[in-house]
A protein has these predicted regions:
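Non-transmembrane functional regions of envelope-associated proteins
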Residues: 1-181
């Protein structure tokens, strides 16, 4: 029994402290994540634009009228989510901001934030670090915002996020906070 226990501890140490073991541990974690799965909440909606949709809507920039119409439909069909994340960066002011802001104010919208200047690797931002500008009408209409910075691991997979960056929670946490208000 002692030999089996010792062998198990040595194997665990190898998985934790060696590069090869770390790679095996990551694969185990990835596989367990797939097997366990994830059940999305039906009252949380994430709006993102895929390539097919981008082309169907005429390419970039996509008119903000489309997003306002989507929000109007969600309200008309009694399908208003408890959190609506717009995974889109709005970095300039356009005349369609006001109609979009009106629809946003009727829903629990969360906007993403990115740093205006990239940070050197491993450097933590300071409080008040400059975030990329968002049109004021949209900023006021949103119920929350969160950063969308991620760090890919050496194998190209994201296995975690920084829960807080300067004064911003991560986008997913901001959506959860808005959902539970």
């Amino acid at each position: 029994l002692a030999i089996t226990l010792l062998a198990g501890l040595l194997l665990l140490a190898a998985l934790v402290w060696t590069p090869a073991g770390n790679a095996v541990g990551k694969r185990i974690y990835d596989q367990l994540s797939i097997w366990i799965g994830f059940q999305a909440s039906p009252d949380v909606v994430l709006v993102a634009i895929d390539e097919r949709t981008r082309l169907a809507l005429g390419g970039w920039p996509i008119s903000r009228r489309h997003f306002a119409t989507l929000m109007e439909r969600l309200l008309q069909e009694d399908q208003a989510p408890r959190a609506l994340g717009l995974d889109l960066l709005f970095t300039n002011t356009v005349p369609a901001d006001e109609p979009l802001a009106e629809q946003m104010a009727r829903l629990p919208v969360v906007l993403p934030k990115v740093m205006s200047q990239p940070l050197p690797l491993m450097q933590a931002p300071s409080a008040g670090q400059a975030w990329q500008w968002t049109p004021p009408a949209l900023e006021r209409a949103a119920r929350g915002s969160g950063h969308i910075h991620v760090r890919f691991e050496s194998d190209g997979i994201i296995r975690g996020v920084q829960t807080r960056l300067a004064d911003q929670a991560h986008f997913s946490i901001a959506m959860l906070e808005v959902r539970t208000r």
